[in-house]
Swiss-Prot record:
<feature type="domain" description="Pyruvate carboxyltransferase">
    <location>
        <begin position="13"/>
        <end position="265"/>
    </location>
</feature>
<feature type="binding site">
    <location>
        <position position="204"/>
    </location>
    <ligand>
        <name>Mn(2+)</name>
    </ligand>
</feature>
<keyword id="KW-0058">Aromatic hydrocarbons catabolism</keyword>
<comment type="similarity">
    <text>Belongs to the 4-hydroxy-2-oxovalerate aldolase family.</text>
</comment>
<keyword id="KW-0464">Manganese</keyword>
<protein>
    <recommendedName>
        <fullName>4-hydroxy-2-oxovalerate aldolase</fullName>
        <ecNumber>4.1.3.39</ecNumber>
    </recommendedName>
</protein>
<dbReference type="GO" id="GO:0009098">
    <property type="term" value="P:L-leucine biosynthetic process"/>
</dbReference>
<dbReference type="InterPro" id="IPR013785">
    <property type="entry name" value="Aldolase_TIM"/>
</dbReference>
<dbReference type="InterPro" id="IPR017629">
    <property type="entry name" value="4OH_2_O-val_aldolase"/>
</dbReference>
<feature type="binding site">
    <location>
        <position position="22"/>
    </location>
    <ligand>
        <name>Mn(2+)</name>
    </ligand>
</feature>
<keyword id="KW-0479">Metal-binding</keyword>
<dbReference type="GO" id="GO:0030145">
    <property type="term" value="F:manganese ion binding"/>
</dbReference>
<dbReference type="InterPro" id="IPR035685">
    <property type="entry name" value="DRE_TIM_HOA"/>
</dbReference>
<dbReference type="Pfam" id="PF00682">
    <property type="entry name" value="HMGL-like"/>
</dbReference>
<dbReference type="GO" id="GO:0008701">
    <property type="term" value="F:4-hydroxy-2-oxovalerate aldolase activity"/>
</dbReference>
<feature type="binding site">
    <location>
        <position position="204"/>
    </location>
    <ligand>
        <name>substrate</name>
    </ligand>
</feature>
<keyword id="KW-0456">Lyase</keyword>
Length: 352
């Protein structure tokens, strides 16, 4: 079964709001049904075309390793689909975390866009999942996470694997918020050149170096047709590119999205902000993640281990970057914390 990409000919770019997925990291996966319903309704009124809803780590992510959801994600997907009048509901899945059965259940609950994420060198593990999603008639999007870690030409080769498997849009995903302007431009351009008309190209940014909006503009100018953001930067680390700022900038440079600037600003201020446990901050921890290239969802895990072992979170994050840890290796923060703790104790003993 084939499915067309949901893309209004009046748009230059399709925007996906990921507050209810990436924001789940910041909220420690504690969304309530009332919050999801209110946020979806507000985004829908503003004209946001795609709203992503799942556990922060995708389908099946509710676990001891990643953190348990307050409300089962499939219930939230169903509620979001019932609430949205115009917007499509997307869901994320990571092979090895989610399963084919999870994809089928998400579709049955009203999800219509399946976004499949792998580390940027492991696109081949997504092949069977893209095949299933296309058979089911789902629109497909591929995420090449931690895209800053390999050069553009290598990233393009991985994008080709996804496109050949049935992916209709491959994203350059700056999971660490580590890419700087031309780093985004070169990677997006490489994917556009490789994929041609076979698939669109997208960009997912984080604010860890304060460049989420600027990097998204670079991506669009390099040929990206899909862009991610989160209202109020509601996402992992310092958060994602704020949708309300993206729309303001896109309006000013003539990039059409179909989203009303004033309505999305209202949604961010009046509906999304009250659901946030705190603002997403560009603080020392977030900056270290962007500077050292650390997966943004490590932030809350690092803070937890910092409190548990009495070591600085920013040091944990810096060493995670030095070790080139990727998503799924959050448990190694415990080893790093113990290492720093031993160093502190030996240093204190030597000083006596």
């Amino acid at each position: 079964m084939t499915t067309d990409i949901f893309f209004n000919p009046m748009w230059d770019v399709r925007l996906t709001d990921t507050s209810l997925r990436d924001g789940s990291h910041h909220k420690r996966h504690q969304f309530t049904k009332d919050e999801v319903q209110a946020i979806v309704a507000a985004l829908d009124v503003a004209g946001v075309p795609v709203i992503e809803v799942t556990h922060g780590d995708g389908l099946g992510g509710s676990s001891f390793n990643y953190g348990f959801s307050k409300t089962p994600e499939q219930e939230l997907i169903k509620l979001a689909a019932e609430t949205a009048k115009e917007a499509k509901i997307a869901f994320l899945m990571l092979p090895g975390v989610g399963t084919k059965e999870d994809i089928k259940e998400a579709q049955n609950n009203g999800g219509s866009i399946c976004r499949i994420a792998t580390h940027c060198t492991e696109a081949d593990v997504s092949i069977q999942h893209f095949g299933l999603a296309r058979e089911l008639g789902l629109e497909t999007v591929g995420f090449l996470m931690m895209s800053h870690t390999i050069p553009p030409e290598k990233l393009a080769q991985q994008a080709r694997i996804m496109a050949d498997a049935g992916c209709q849009c491959v994203y350059v995903v700056d999971s660490a918020g580590a890419l700087v302007l031309e780093g985004v431009r070169d990677r997006v351009a490489a994917l556009v050149a490789e994929l041609g008309d076979d698939a669109q190209v997208g960009f997912h940014g984080h604010e860890n170096l304060g460049l989420g909006v600027a990097n998204s503009v670079e991506a669009v100018r390099a040929g990206a047709k899909q862009i991610d953001g989160s209202c109020r930067r509601f996402g992992a680390g310092a958060g994602n590119a704020p949708v309300e700022a993206l729309i303001g900038v896109f309006d000013k440079i003539g990039v059409k999205t179909g989203i009303d600037f004033f309505d999305i600003a209202d949604a961010a201020e009046e509906v999304v902000a009250p659901a946030m446990p705190a603002e997403c901050l560009l603080d020392r921890n977030a900056l270290i993640m962007g500077y050292s290239g650390v997966y943004s969802s490590f932030l809350k895990h690092a803070i937890r281990q910092s409190e548990r072992y009495g070591v600085p979170a920013h040091q944990l994050l810096h060493r995670a970057g030095q070790r080139k840890l990727i998503g799924g290796q959050e448990d190694q923060l415990i080893d790093i914390a113990l290492e720093i703790k031993r160093e502190q104790e030996s240093g204190a003993a030597a000083a006596r």
